[in-house]
Each structure stands twice: as C-alpha cells, then as structure tokens.
UniProtKB/Swiss-Prot annotation:
Transmembrane segments: none annotated. The gene is SEC31. It is found in: Cytoplasmic vesicle, COPII-coated vesicle membrane; Endoplasmic reticulum membrane. This is Protein transport protein SEC31. The COPII coat is composed of at least 5 proteins: the SEC23/24 complex, the SEC13/31 complex, and the protein SAR1. SEC13 and SEC31 make a 2:2 tetramer that forms the edge element of the COPII outer coat. The tetramer self-assembles in multiple copies to form the complete polyhedral cage. Interacts (via WD 8) with SEC13. InterPro entries: SEC31-like (IPR040251), SRA1/Sec31 (IPR009917), WD40/YVTN_repeat-like_dom_sf (IPR015943), WD40_repeat_dom_sf (IPR036322), WD40_rpt (IPR001680). It is a peripheral membrane protein. Residues 909-919 have a biased composition (Low complexity). Residues 460-495, 794-820, 868-1007, 1066-1136 are annotated as: Disordered. It comes from the Eukaryota. Component of the coat protein complex II (COPII) which promotes the formation of transport vesicles from the endoplasmic reticulum (ER). The coat has two main functions, the physical deformation of the endoplasmic reticulum membrane into vesicles and the selection of cargo molecules. Its main location: membrane.
Length: 1244
C-alpha cells in the first residue's frame, strides 16, 4: 500500500472515468465534524497532479449535504460525463463535468435539478452499458430510472414483492442493461427487470448469528447471474455471493469483519478482487471467487462508510471514513518499513518523527497478482530467429508454441552470404542497379562498384580525366594544329613514330636534322651591347657559372637555361629557382615546379579543387608508389567532399576514395546516408515489403555491408577494418550482425565480425562462437582455494585476454618434454628437501598478498637423490609463457565490501583456466597431517641453455637483478615497523624435510578470512646472503616459526601459532601456497633451484625459535628481538606537513570524497565511514612521508587527477596500474581509493 493522497473531508465521493481520474467529493449527510460546522460543499480533486494535490481544483458551497455522488462515463454531448448528486432533502442535481472543470461555475454547469423523490436519496448509479441512464433509490422504497439525455419524467421499475422502507443501495447488471438490483433495510435484495417492469427475484439470508440486513449490493463484472451483498448487522457482518440460478442460498460467505459492512466494490478489471469497509473501521481485500480474504489495509479512527476502485486505474482505490479523511491508496504495498521511515539516532527526534509517521502497514494473508498484471498471452523473439508464443486454453493452462520467424529483408542476407562464399558480387550489383526501390545515390554507388569490378580502379579516374579530350571536336584540333604549324611538319612516313610518342604529348620526327650553324659572323658587332659582350667573354672563357649568374642578374633566363643544360646540377637548380621566383604567380610556373621536382604535393594540396580532373591526372602520371598514390588521391577526395564548387562532389569524392582504397572514407559517407535511405524506403511506393522502421533499418544495413563486402572483394582487400572511422563503421556492422544472428544466420554474422577489431566486437564474436559451438578448446582448470583438501599443481596463468582471445591459446614450448596432462609425472633427480620452485619474477595473483618467491636461494648444493614417484598426478592446464596480470578484486563479500548499489553492472566474464598460487593471508594455527608425496617437476636439460625470463614490462624499478654480497653468516631477520594500518605478514610456510626422506607433507591451507585484510609485504633487500654452509645439512620435521605479526585492527582475534622446531635458521622454507608448486614454464625458471642467490626481493630467513636440533646440525642463531614500533613524526589527523609534491593527492581525494558522501545511501553509511578512514590512513602517510616513493606519488597523482576530472575509466585503469607497479607500498588505504572510484562512478 502506498498512500497517494489524504483528503481532510468527511465526504462521500465518486471517481471520474479518466485515465488519470479526478475525484468528486460532497459533504456527507448525517456527520458532524469537530467544529460542528453545518456547511456543505462540492469539490473536485486532481489526485495525480504534479503540482499540488492538497487543494481542490474546484470548490463550491451548496445548500444541503450529500448522501451519494455518481459520475458517468462520457456519452453524446457530455465529453467528460455527468456528475449526479443525491441530497438529504430528496433533490437530485446534475452537472456537466467538462463545463464545471473549465468554468469553475456551479450554476453554469448545472443541467438539471429534480425533486421527484419525496425523501432523502440514498444511492445513485449510472448504467455501465448505457452511460446516460441513471438509477436512484431513497426513502419510502422509491426507485427511479432517469434518462439524462432528455431528462424526461423518471419512471419506477415496478412494485416490490416486499415493501421496503428505505433503499440503501442500487446497482446495474454489468452484462444486461435492463437488469438492476436494489437492497434496503427490510433484509431483502430485489432483482428488477425493466423490460417487464417488475421485481423478478428477491434474496434474503438468515444464519446462525441472525438475519442479514443488506446495506450494499454489487454485480459480477462479467457474469450476469452473479452478485454480492453486504450486511451491516453487527451480529451478522457477512459478505454473501449469490448465483441467481440457485437463489435459495448464497454461494460463498465471506467472514472477517467484526462489525457491520457498509460498503463494497467489485473490481471491474479483475473479478477476483473485491474491496469492503465497515463499522469496524477496517478495509479488507477479498477474492470473492474463492471466498478468501487476501489482505487488510490500515484501519481508520471511525467507521469506513465508503470504498471504491478508480474505474480506469483499478490499482488505486479510495476509502472515506467518519474520522474526517478520504484516503487514496494503491492495492500493492511498496512502502518502506517504519524502521526506514524513522531514521534519527537522537531519542527526542526519534519520538517526534514516530509520532508524525504513518506506522500502519497493510497485512496480506495471501499474495495474489491482479488480473492486469498477469499475462494471458505473450510473445517473444528468441535468439536464432525463433518466435515463442504463450497462450491459454479454455482451462487456463498455458500453451507454448515455438516457430521459426522469417523477417522481411532476410532474403537479401541470404544472397549476400552466397556472394561472400563464392566471392562473386556480380548478381548483387546487377540487382541493386536495376532495383526500383534503391535511391539515386545508392544506384550511383553500385554503378561505380560495377565499373570498378569490370575495369579496375585505374580506369575509374582515366575515363574522367580523358573525357574532355575525347569530347574536343576534330575541327578544333585541326585548327590548333594549323595554328601551330604541326600538320605541315609531320610527313606520312612518320606515322608510327607519331603514334608512339603521342602518349608523351610531343612528336619527334625521324628525319628532323639537328641545328648546325653556318656562315660567318662577328663576335662583337656594332649592335652588341656591353652586357652581351661581358656575357660572351665569360662564356668563351669557360666561366659558365659566372655567366649563368650574370644572366640571372640581368634577367636573361633563356640564356641562363641554355648555359645550364650542360652545367652541374647545382647550376641547374640555381637557374630553376630563379625562374620560379620570377614567375611565382603564374599557373604554369606552379605546375612546372611540381613536375620538375617530381613531387606534386603542392598541386594536390593547393590547386583549385575545381580543376580536380587535372589534379587527378597529375597524381596518376607522377605518382608511382602505390601507398603515395592512395594517400594523394584520398586527400583529393577529402578536398572535393568538403568543397561546394565541384558538381556531384559526393560521387566524385567516392570515385577518388575507390581509386585510393580508402574504404573507411567511403563507408563513412554511406554510414551518414543510412537514415536518409531508411526514410526513402519507408516513403517509397515501390517498397511494398517495408512496413516498419525496423525492416527499413535491416534493409539499409544489409545494403551498407553489401557495398563494403563488394568493394573489399573487388579490390582484394583482407584484414580488419582500420582507420579513423573504424569505430562507427564497426558499430554499424555489429548492429547488422546482431540482427542477422537473431535471425539464425550465424555464419554470415561471423564472416562480418572477422572484419572488426577484437576490442570492438570481442563480445559478439564470443556470442556467435557459443551459438555455433565453435569455441576454441581451452583447457579449464578449477581454482584451488585456500581451504580445500585437494592438493594440485598450482599454475599462475596470464589472464589479461582470456575473454576475447579464446581461439589463440599459445602452446607451451615444453610440451615435448612433459608427460600428457593427467598422466603421472616422471620423477626427477632433484633434492628431496625442496619443492619445485616458481618463477621469481612472477607476482602473486593477489596484489595484497606478499610477493614471495618460492625459489630457495639459500638451499645448499645437495647430492642428487632420486625421489619416489608420485602416487597420483594432478591434471592442470599448461601455463602460458609470460607472467600473470595481477587481479585486484577479492571475492570476500564481507561486511566491509562495497554495497551492490555502487557495484558496476558489468557483464560476467568467463573464468580463465587459472590455478593461482597465493600464500594464505590468515595467520591461523596450522593443522598437522601425515606427509604425502609431492610430484617433482621434470628434469631440466642442461644443454637447453634456458635462462630465467626478464621481468615483465611495467615492473617496479627496484625489481632488478642484484649481485650478491658474500657474507660469513646468514643475515638476521629485518625489524618490521609496527604499523597498525599495514597488513600482517604471511605466517603460512612449509619447512623442508630430511635430505634423504620423501618430499615434505603439506598442511592444508586454512580458509581465507573475508574479514581480514591482505598480509603485509616483507621489506626487500638489495643483496641476498649466501648460505652459511653448503654441505652436511640435515633437516628436522618441523617448520620455521614466522615473525610475530603486528596487531590488525580489522581482523578478528586468531589463535596463537604453534612454533615448531627448526634445524637451520639459514634456510628459508618454501612458502605454503594453495597446493603443490606448478610444473615449469617454457623458460624453465619456475622449478630451477639456483646454486647461489641471484635475485633481489627474496625475504630473509625468519628468526630461529624452538629447541636445539640434532647434534649433527650447527647450533641455531639466537632469536631475534621483538620489533620495536616506530613512532610517527606527526600525530594522526595532522595535514599541515603534507609536502608540496603530495598536496594535490590530498586536495583531489578530499574534493571527490566530499562530493560522494552526501549521495551514499543511509544503510551504507558504515561503508562510507570506512572509506574515509582508509583515505585518512593515506593522508597520515603523506603527512609523515613514511610510505610512498616519489615515483609512486607521481603515479597516484595521475589517478587522482583523472578521478577529479570525472574520467572514471582512466582513473580505474591508472589505479590498476598503480597497484601492479607499486605493490610493495600498498596497504589498507589503497582499498579506499578503489572504493572511492567505484562510488564516484555510481554518482556521476
């Protein structure tokens, strides 16, 4: 129940028949309010108004009070129906509802007023089948039928069998318009037939508790022979259902009211819902068909004398009571509990809120959905062009029908698939060109594709660039030839030579003799100028360079060019530059410049695009490199497309793009035209098969991808779509593949998905692969958790691209030397005191777990001893060759986890075939189990030359290979800083067994505690010490005790750890992970035990604790002292000493936190407080400068900057990188930043 409105009136009411109904109220007769006010008013209320529902939209005073109100459905001449009022003085008045609402004038809206009744009128109802017919009943047993169209004299339905003193209720039959029922204080309910004008039947009931005194009657919404009556007798407060075919006794008796029932209403939209109210101040919801009470709504302070559903909104009903309220509420209860309404922690405020809060909630005994919320029939499209239909038979049972659905336009997709398989688009091209449905632009595109298929891309430009020459008339050519004198110089015998050289634009005649001067001449004649004399002297003196320079200075470029012909290249360039500088504004000079330099970039970029044909001819003539040609012709297409001076710029640009293999450019144009093509398909008279926008969209997308496929086939283009427009094109193709895949054409969808980059269509590819069963075989392995009893070989796998690169699983290079998966591993000649080691470069999959290498760098060079074969091999998937990508999500779901409100709704990713090898973070006591065999790793070939792999990209700067320093004794354990915010160190380690014994038994890991934080990362050392002794070392069966962990404020108290004996403190026991160490990787570094320390970052041995071991072992070093906690420089909460380099982190995080806090739901307040606490831990570290390095601070600044600028995606990515690169500096504070990013994402 949701209380929609509460009207402070003691009034009767009537609903309008509008979709959002209006409520009419009239002051009820016979009631006295607290002020003893005797006035009366008619009011209209817009309950669903968005502005103000506390005030009526109309109110007018009337002389007398009301017994009943009725509001008819719209009918002829009354668009919003009539309002009829029954007054206590026997008057019935009618108002036009529309006039009343618009004019707000009661007198103007009044259409009729009658005093036909001789006493008070108790009940009114309009006929549901004939909206203009009204029945009224009142005192003295008077019942009248009114025609509100003509307002003629009302008539009586006839004489009653048993006279009644007062009619309390009248009701029309909902199926037969001339049948009505009436009931009164005589204890009878009469059935009237207006056609025969007589009472045909009357009903009465006498039970064990007495005689029923009927107060209300209502007909079944759909069955003409069933009705229901209510008794207001306190001794017999019953609701009776009747079937007139057996009127001797009621069909059902509904018991539940403690006192008399005053009102009921049978829902017209659901015959299985009935609402009633009465003298016991209650309102009940019933199923009258079964006779069961469904629920009870909050009680009132006085009699609830009327209740009724809204005619067009049956989920809403109103109840009027004598406590001065009309409550409008909903059937369903969606209100929050009282505990959420009253939220104050202050006692005084709590009781104040409680006193003003509606604490009553409806109580439902039986949950039953209304008929309008049930689905009598349903239909749904299924994946693969399936259509599922659900319907009901005559017995109400569901019938499910699944059939194949063939969408319009699906035939085009089938033709496209055939063309793709045969690599032949000729039929599709011909069909598109001849189609009556295609637009002109679409046809022009297909014609270009046809020319491209027939002639090639070279001919596409050639036919355009040679059009004008072909159109030039022969007379014009001849006149030009005569003008130039060329025709006289070409004899008939030179025809062959002429045509051979015609393509070069010049004619060289075979018998043309070279120029040879003859006759005498003067070197210096009288007409020779001094300038020419100087030039002649320079030339004759073979000073060609000076002569050229002189010619250039005097502007004699012709002579300079002749002199430069046989000169050096520098002189030629000098002359050319002089020429171009002098004729810089001449068009021919710009063209000659590009031609002489064999680079037409200037022409392509700067020439007027109106001369695009000449530009295209130049590109064709002077560009020999295919990539350069494609680039320049595509640039020309861009300029044409942007130009407004070129006719048919769109088609011309596409022609250039086709010639330049610029598929992304062409597809961008086609993509922009998709909406226009869809509109054309919907408006075209020839497109008879297109009847909806979805069909037009499918046809347009099919046409789009068909063009792309045809062009790629014609141009022999392979590979994925790329370029600046790859993303929008890919989205359109993905949309098309979703449509055709939904029609069951998975092969066609898969073909087009292969054209798209994986980062844009990876999910769709997986979806199609699953549907077709073509998922690549990937060996799956179950993740071994820290609490399972099974022991498996643990493999840390790379999982960065598992969800997309399913079909490209690399094969490990060690495959030939390793037994098949699931087969027992051959025993290796390795010391039995060790277990197969891990790659020291591989990080733990949990970023909060300590980075511990399982390679024992302190292990002595022991003699090779053959280990016993394993009893049972464990099947694992082959590990990839690279280090893993860290995974930062912890599936703990503890009290401190982020609430679901803030979790992003990302689709579930497929689990990777990974077995993680992470030390257990919980320092709980170990359970001793009998030793069991560990399958040793395969023997490493000495001739393979395998070396440890380099660290992964992005690894920490301090993870470098360090040269070990030889020391005489093992280095003592480092003193840990007692930081209450840092996670505790790992306590789960295994001790090596006796050298000649079977492999050590492994204790089962304890279950991960969801409330405990990740363990502390041990401090790193630059140089690892060598072992104290390399011979004669024996081991006892005990394990080295871990150092005492610092107090963790977030973890529950744990039992004390049993400290077993240790035989040699100089040996670092391998860490206890979640099972036996995995097989080797292809580099062979995960199981090789080095002779001497070679890597930094390996934790030193823990302090020796326990009793003195066997006499053969050297005495252990003294136990380390308890770490002394280091006091912070500044108190907690101090922010005044945050250095300048870190203050930006503090400012940005504080700003985002203050923006997020007001939006945190109240029930997640604890999460918000925990978030702030974690950030304060970081701020304390920044203030004390005791945790983060400068590199870490800079990386964290990038995270905070992205978060402050609301770039959530970048912030999340940078935060992940930060955790991977600075794992040794993480703590409880980092979880706070991760949670802040997620909360900010939910808010923004």
């Amino acid at each position: 129940m949701v209380k929609i409105s509460e009207i402070a009136r003691t009034s009767t009411f009537a609903w309008s028949s509008d979709t959002l109904p209006i409520l009419a109220t009239g002051t009820v007769a016979g009631a006295v309010d607290a002020s003893f006010n005797s006035s009366s008013s008619l009011e209209l209320w817009d309950i669903f108004s968005a502005t103000n529902t506390n005030e009526p939209i109309f109110s007018a005073a009337v002389e007398h009070r009301f017994y009943a109100l009725a509001w008819s459905k719209p009918f002829e001449g009354r668009p919003r129906g009539l309002i009829a009022a029954a007054f206590e003085n026997g008057v019935i008045e009618f108002w036009d509802a529309e006039v009343l609402i618009i004019s707000k004038d009661l007198a103007k809206a009044s259409v009729h007023k009658s005093s036909k009744h001789s006493g008070p009128v108790r009940s009114l109802q309009f006929n549901p089948l004939q909206s203009h017919v009204l029945v009224s009943g009142g005192s003295h047993g008077q019942i009248f039928i009114w025609d509100t169209k003509k307002f003629t004299e009302p008539f009586s339905p006839g004489s009653a069998m048993t006279p009644m003193d007062e009619i309390s209720s009248v009701a029309w039959n909902n199926s037969v318009s001339h049948i009505l029922a009436s009931t009164g204080n005589s204890g009878y309910t009469s059935i009237w037939d207006l056609k025969s004008k007589r009472e045909v039947l009357h009903l009465s009931y006498t039970g064990a508790s007495g005689r029923a005194n009927f107060s209300h009657v209502a007909w079944h919404p759909t069955k003409s022979t069933e009705l229901i009556t209510a008794s207001d007798n306190d001794a017999c407060p019953l609701i009776l259902t009747w079937d007139l075919r057996n009127s001797n006794a009621p069909e059902k008796i509904l018991e539940g009211h403690k006192k008399g029932v005053l009102s009921l209403d049978w829902c017209q939209q659901d015959p299985e819902l009935l609402i009633s109210s009465g003298k016991d101040n209650t309102t009940f919801l019933w199923n009258p068909t079964t006779g069961q009470k469904l629920g009870e709504y909050p009680t009132t302070a006085n009699w609830a004398f009327q209740t009724a559903f809204a005619p067009k909104v049956p989920d809403i009903f109103a109840t009027a009571s004598f406590d001065g309220k009309i409550v409008v509420q909903s059937l369903q209860d969606t209100s929050p509990p009282v505990s959420e309404k009253v939220t104050s922690n202050d006692d005084n405020v709590f009781w104040n809120q409680l006193s003003t809060t509606d604490t009553q909630q409806p109580v439902f005994d039986i949950k039953q959905a209304p008929q309008w919320l049930k689905t009598p029939s349903a239909v749904s499209f299924g994946f693969g062009s399936k259509l599922v239909q659900v319907s009901k038979d005559s017995n109400g049972k569901s019938i499910i029908n699944i059939q194949k659905f063939v969408a319009k336009g699906q035939s085009s997709s089938s033709e496209l698939y055939t063309a793709l398989k045969n690599n032949n688009f000729k039929s599709i091209i011909d069909e598109k060109i001849s189609s009556n449905v295609a637009s002109d632009l679409d046809k022009s595109d297909w014609k270009l594709l046809q020319k491209l298929a027939e002639s090639g891309k070279d001919e596409i430009l050639t036919e355009v660039t040679t059009e004008e020459e072909e159109k030039k008339p022969e007379t014009e050519i001849e006149s030009e030839d005569k003008k130039n004198g060329d025709s006289e110089d070409v004899p008939a015998s030179a025809d062959d030579s002429f045509f051979d050289n015609l393509g070069n634009g010049k004619v060289v005649l075979e018998n043309e003799a070279p120029f040879v001067p003859s006759g005498s001449f003067k070197i210096f004649s009288a007409k020779v100028s001094e300038e020419d004399k100087s030039l002649i002297k320079l030339v004759l003196g073979n000073k060609i360079e000076d002569a050229v320079h002189d010619c250039i200075e005097r502007g004699k470029l012709l002579e300079a060019l002749v002199l430069a012909l046989d000169a050096s290249d520098d002189i030629k360039e000098k002359v050319k530059n002089a020429y171009f500088k002098k004729n810089v504004k001449k068009e021919v000079s710009r063209v000659l410049y590009s031609v002489s330099s064999q680079n037409i970039t200037d022409i392509v970029s700067n020439a007027n695009v109106a001369n695009w044909k000449e530009i295209a001819a130049g590109i064709t003539s002077f560009t020999n490199d295919p990539d350069d040609f494609n680039s320049k012709i595509t640039e020309l297409g861009d300029r044409i497309l942007e130009s407004k001076t070129v006719a048919d710029s769109r088609d011309t640009a596409i022609r250039c793009y086709l010639a330049g293999n610029a598929l992304d450019k062409i597809a961008s144009i086609w993509l922009k035209e998709l909406p226009a093509l869809e509109a054309h398909l919907l408006e075209s008279d020839n497109a008879e098969n297109v009847s909806s926008p979805s069909e037009a969209r499918l046809i347009a997308l099919t046409n789009f991808v068909s063009k792309i496929a045809a062009y790629r086939s014609i141009s022999n283009i392979s590979g994925e779509i790329s370029g600046p427009s790859a993303e929008p094109i890919s989205k359109a193709i993905v949309e098309y593949t979703n449509l055709v895949a939904g029609n069951g054409e998975f092969e066609l969808a898969n073909i087009f998905l292969q054209l798209l980059p994986s980062d844009l269509a990876g999910t769709e590819k997986d979806r199609i692969n699953k549907a077709t069963g073509a998922v690549a075989a990937v060996t799956a392995s179950k993740t071994v958790k820290s609490g399972t009893s099974a022991v498996a070989n643990s493999v840390t796998a790379k999982t960065s691209k598992v969800s997309r690169e399913v079909s490209s699983t690399p094969k490990p290079s060690y495959q030939a030397t390793m037994p098949p998966i699931g087969a027992p591993l051959a025993p290796s000649a390795i010391p039995s005191a060790s277990v197969p080691s891990s790659n020291p470069y591989v990080r733990a999959s949990n970023p909060y777990a300590p980075h511990v290498s399982s390679t024992n760098i302190y292990k002595p060079a022991a003699p090779v001893v053959q280990a016993p074969p394993p009893a049972q091999a464990t099947a694992v998937s082959p590990p990839p060759t690279g280090p893993p990508k860290p995974v930062y999500k912890q599936e703990t779901d503890g009290w401190n986890d982020l609430p679901d409100t803030f979790k992003s709704k990302a689709p579930a990713r497929r689990a990777a075939a990974v077995v993680t090898a992470t030390p257990s973070p919980t320092p709980l006591p170990q359970t001793t189990v009998p030793p069991m065999s560990i399958p040793p790793g395969p023997k490493r070939s000495m001739s393979s030359g395998s070396a440890a792999p380099p660290p992964p990209k992005g690894s920490r700067a301090n993870s470098k290979v360090a040269v070990p320093t030889i020391q005489s004794s093992p280095r003592p354990a480092p003193v840990h800083v007692n930081n209450r915010y840092a996670p505790p160190p790992s306590a789960d380690v295994n001790a090596p067994s006796n050298t000649h014994s079977s492999p050590v038994g492994v204790s089962p890991s304890t279950k991960k505690n969801p409330y405990a934080v990740a363990p502390e990362v041990a401090p790193r050392v630059a140089y690892a010490p060598p072992p104290a002794s390399l011979s004669g070392l024996g081991f006892s069966g005990g394990a080295a005790a871990p150092p005492a962990p610092p107090k963790n404020p977030y973890a529950p108290s744990a039992s004390s750890v049993i400290s077993p004996r240790v035989s040699n403190a100089g040996i670092v026991p391998p860490p206890m992970g979640r099972g036996i160490v995995s097989p080797p990787t292809s580099f062979g570094s995960m199981h090789a035990a080095p002779i001497q320390p070679a890597f930094s970052g390996v934790p030193p041995p823990p302090p020796a604790i326990g009793h003195q071991p066997a006499a053969s072992a050297p005495p252990p070093p003294p136990a380390a002292k308890t770490p002394v906690p280091t006091k912070s420089k500044y108190p907690k909460g101090d922010r005044s000493h945050i250095p300048e380099k870190s203050v930006l982190i503090y400012q940005y995080l504080t700003k985002v936190l203050e923006a997020v806090k007001p939006n945190i739901p109240e029930k997640y307040t604890a999460h918000g407080e925990d978030l702030e606490k974690r950030l304060n831990i970081l701020f304390d570290h920044l203030n004390n400068e005791d945790l983060l390095t400068d590199d870490a601070i800079e990386d964290l600044k990038e995270v905070c900057t992205a978060l402050e600028s609301k770039d959530i995606e970048s912030a999340s990515s940078l935060n992940t990188s930060f955790a991977a690169n600075h794992i040794d500096q993480l703590g409880n504070w980092h979880r706070g930043i991760t949670r802040l990013i997620t909360m900010a994402e939910a808010m923004y």
